Amino acid sequence: PTNCPGIPRNLVVTVNPIPAVTNAILSQDICAGTTSSPVVLTSNVAGTTFSWTATGNAGLSGYQASGTGNIPAMQIFSNLTTQGAVRYTITPRGPSTPSCAGTPVIYTINVDPAPIVTNASMQQSICTGDKTTAVTLTSNIASTTFTWTANAVPASMTGYQASGTNTIPAQTIVNNSNVQGVITYHIIPSNSPSGCVGIPSDYVVYVNPKPVASVVQSVISLCSGTTTNIALLSNVAGTTFSWTASSPGSINGLGDGTGNVIAQTLINTSNAPHPVHY
């Protein structure tokens, strides 16, 4: 060999930094059915791009399964009775070729369940002046508390509690009108300790008026063999009537019955007037 020197060449090796996700907070809590806050992703390397995939508990829905860049706001639903979670696995990549990938980081959205009222029956009926049955409210979540307000139609009804928490107590309610009264208890369930508010429900108490029977004339005089024509009236529309009939004398043709008109042919078999009592 001649040991002749060659022509030098310069070789430049660029060593790109490995990016990292630098968000200080990597989780948030929301209530089922509400919208999460968008997540602006940050890195220690300018120009870093992000890709992410999401996995959630069975029973959660509404979240985006994958994406790039920031994590957008999402309305997430849950049919769970305990807290669920959506976990976003975020991979940062540097801006220059070969786009070095950093260590994946997990961002978690915890989804607290929203309670619902689960009572099988949501109504009852009483007559005015009677006492309601107390209503023990139930939910799909054991720690649920309830607040409720009552609205009465007509507003003249008395005896009901205007608002309260948890059990709706037994109450003696008076409806002095001639129409059916309705008291609607608007119930809002909330989950303790998360405070998540569920879908409101209504419990209804129907308060029926007590009808009063009346006739145009309370005392009528008839000749034997004449048919009565006594129209029965009431202060409450739709009232039905039943009656019993009796007489201390010798009267034929009377009897118990039902309907809106008492039509009976009464025959006095004696020589003296006798009353018939309905």
Question: What are these language model-derived features?
Answer:
Residues 1-278:
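Extracellular low-complexity Ser/Thr/Asn/Gly-rich intrinsically disordered segments
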